[in-house]
Amino acid sequence: MKLFSNYDRLVSFVSVHQAVLAEEALNQAGIAVLLIPTPRDLAISCGMCLLFSQLTQGTVFEIFAKQNILWSKYYSCQADKRVYEKLGEYKGG
């Protein structure tokens, strides 16, 4: 599915509220994201996650830290092929 081909990172959240806050913050920063239901293959978190590009990864997590957005886990992904590799977990802070 070409729609997801530009998105190679997926981040899950501790709540739907945090997912929506993250989407709004990243949209305001001009970062392209897609808020989607968490893929069944991952069965984690609140049920919502964001897809974004690896090219924006540093900025994404800087915004999360500055705005106290609580995320759960993040993955590299080929969303169109349903292939996910866990890269990290939120450690708090």
Model regions: which residues?
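Solvent-exposed alpha-helices and their adjacent loops that cap or buttress functional pockets
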Residues: K2-S5, L42
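Amphipathic, hydrophobic secondary-structure cores in small proteins
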Residues: L10, V14-V20, N27-K66, S72
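Charged, amphipathic alpha-helical interaction segments
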Residues: E24-N27, K81
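C-terminal structural segments of small proteins and small subunits
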Residues: G58-G93
